[in-house]
Amino acid sequence: MTVTTTKHEALRRALIAAAFACPVAIIAPALAQAKTVLRISTPAVPDDWHVKMLYVFKDELARAVPGRFDVQVHHSGTLFRQGAEAVAMQRGNLDMALLSMQDIARQIPEYSIFTAGYLIRDPDHLAKVYGGPIGEELSRTIAETMGIQLLQAVYLGTRQVSLAQPRRVRTPADLAGVKLRMPGSKEWLFLGQALGANPTPLAFTEVYLGLKTGTIDGQDNPLPTLKSAKLYEVTRQIVLTGHLVDVLQLAISSKAWNALPSGDKAEVKKAAAKAAKFNDENRVREEKELIEFFRAQGIEITTPDVEAFRKTVQAAYLKSEYAEKWPRGLLERINATR
């Protein structure tokens, strides 16, 4: 073998090695950069604890499994309008959302029980109902029926009635004729009717202008939402009805959920729990502090006959077509949860 032959052989081997190495060099960075994208939609505004909570969720995942997820938070209803998220998830157009029980009841009518006024007593009762056996049954049914996996129940707040112009409100009869903004589903509108008002459907993003122009006379939301969305600027009175201790469900589509390895699923659940804890603690704290803040803004704070509201609202639900579909014994189990 000559020196020339040896050189040619060495060159041939080098070229073959390079040919095999190039695809690896190209593929390896691509694999390293591959992330699971999770797009989350919420109607909440940036200052709301729910949006802040979603960034806690994002940060917790980034810390626990660096580089594995690309969590994209779309706030203020910019991706999907309020109430459209569940269907978007089912169609594969959205990965995650904060779903209301009203959204769920539209597809599973027997769960309208969870939309009933004066059902949940307080945030602690809420956590025990949704964090216990009832919540587990709820999650299984929703996964099987809707193709959506519930990750964590999240405290929305205790809903109060706020009015653009003050009026005497002691009982539901005093809300007769009041155009009370509610989200657009029939479950929400029924609640407004049960309160004695004239429920008026309006998108959350339009509530501020609606109060300002008189399109609506009032709206119902938890106090932290009143502040974060600056609705207090067009509010003259808050009536402390406390008619709904409200929950949202941080949820993920089954399509996105089933695509995750078991280890990633565990980290997603942990991140959801930590995010919910952050939200719940801050909302409970802020609800206690905001009464004085609103008084300082010149808003009249009034306490009605809550028992009169409770009896009227509960009677309306028990006589409705909704109650006919409630699972047997579930109301008693919710009431008995301590």
Question: What do the predicted segments below correspond to?
Answer:
Residues V3-A19, P23-A30:
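Twin-arginine (Tat) signal peptide motif
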Residues M1-V3, I40:
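Intrinsically disordered, low-complexity segments enriched in Ser/Pro/Gly/Ala and basic residues
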Residues E9, A17-F20, Q33-L126, I134, ...:
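N-terminal secretory/targeting leader peptides
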